[in-house]
Amino acid sequence: NALTSEEGEQVVDGETQASTDDGSSRVVDMIVQLKDGTDTAAALASINSAVAAIYPDASAEVSREYTNAFTGFALSAPIGSMDAIRGVSGVQSAFLDHETQVSDDGDDPPADAEGTGGADASADSGSAADAESNPMAAMRAAQHGDVLSAQVMMKADKISQTGAGKVVAIIDTGVDMSHPAFSGGLHGTPAIDSSKGASLAQQVGKSGTYVSEKFPFAYDYADGDNDASPAGAHGTHVAGTAANGDQIMGIAPDAQIIVAKVARSRGGGIPDSALLAALDDMATLHPDAVNMSLGRTAGMDSDADTLFAGVYEKLQEKGITLDVAGGNEFQAGYGNKSGKNLPYASDPDSSTLGEPGSFAPVVTVASIENARNGANGNYKMSDFSSWGVSPDMRLKPEVTAPGGNIYSSVPGGGYQMMSGTSMATPQMTGASAVVLERVQNDPLFSSLNDRQKVDVVQNLIMGTAVPVVDPGQGGGAYYSPRKQGAGLANLEGATTSSVYPTVNGAADSSRPKAELGDGTNGWHFDVTLHNVSDTPATYELSSQALSENIEGGFFTGHSTDWNGKGVSVSFSGSSVTVPAKGETTVGIDIKPGNEFAQYVSANAPAGTFLDGFVRFTSRTNGQPD
């Protein structure tokens, strides 16, 4: 941004240039994306010529070059030259370098840096026999109660996987890498040793540094140096939840952590240019999972949206899982003039999903409250957790994890509570690592290639997730999938199931969700169950057909199950047996009836959502739902 001197001239990076009346010569930061195959040197020369044709004394000053996830530049130039830059041969798009913030936390309890508070959840965390057969279960059971309760909710206390040999990247505000939480030695062979870490730093063309076995690569993309020390507590808390190795244990305690600091040390803003630089490097660093607990309002800039969507797609194609916070924006009606904090029933679009959570390639994570009084199955979704769907009607979020009242590491050696989808997301980043560890090491999946093994991780996580019953509704109705996605992650199920679902014709076969679009006459979709074991598996089918309740002209955030009471859901069979080493397809038909149609017509003149779940309840011992 430009500063104005006392003489009325603009000062940009210490240089002075004549001010124009319309401000078009003001120098701004922008991102320029080039078309595939464009010669970058020739394109930059043409860009400079285009700028000079309008502002003879100006040029395009390049601060970054992108070469891996996309081709382009971060540069500074007069704002009035942007259209000319867009017109240069080989330029795909050009847009202002926006700033993002880390996802704002939800309503936090008072910080508890002393390490007190929280109930002991160990009564639900397994027997002595479990601990003897699974030493990791014993280690998890010895944790602080607030950490254990969140992990018991996800049944992470039942798993033996630790993320050994896996790498997660934390794109955030930086991490206190000297924190005792990260000081323990890793079990297993690390994916990145000091030699490979040095090689990777050379490959990405920056001076990123190998800090330790736990932190094989760290770089400050916002300020352009090796000091990835935190700007605030956020990144350290997130990293701890994903992969702490101390007694305050993360989901994947043996995973290595790449630290990509993208927030400025002053102000904490995250420039697009820094975020894109980190993402561009991920294509070379190739972590198994990337955590992005950050976001902004969706749909602010179509050129930026198109570029980011392409970058996320490119990383997914490379077998990198992107776990992203859904946002903490409640519902669309929160804070409106009604005083009810509820959306008007005149508009069914109550989505508040932000970017990048709205993009198709990412795994968008919703938040549920940590059951601090013991993980007993009676849970509550976090009010602040944003509702889907995406602007183009894709079903989001994908999955839920504990994000309300999460206890984890903060800079300076302490621990404290934080709340937000930012805190739920690293639970899933750790989950992606441990489930991938299972898939890569389990002979049952040996016939899959490397990319298929990455993809099946999300089939397993979403396929074994447990839909959360809404305690505010009664009658056993679930929260809408627009609030919770597939449900609460069940890591015991995801690390033991030998059957996984796919939805036929889905845009992404690794995401078992049926996105059926608009309509009033009904829908059909098919689900295929794939069995990789030598044992047949039998399931009984059930469903809920949910629609949000309407009271006094407002959507309430709670849903009624209309199945059999205004909506018909039928299956091609009430039970299904999946043969050993085989697959079986089940057809599902959904038909709204007159009773439901009349209710919608009377209460939601612009229409409403009909969503829900199809459940496959296992009737085979040892096989999870």
Region spans (language model):
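Autoinhibitory propeptides
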Residues: 7, 49-167, 181-184, 188
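Substrate-binding/access-modulating region of protease and related hydrolase catalytic domains
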Residues: 39-43, 164, 178, 245, ...
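Extracellular S/T/G-rich loop segment that most often corresponds to the catalytic His/Ser-adjacent loop
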Residues: 205-220, 351-433
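Hydrolase catalytic cores
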Residues: 239-241, 260-264, 288, 400-476, ...
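Surface-exposed binding patches on compact interaction domains or structured appendages
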Residues: 501-512, 533-601
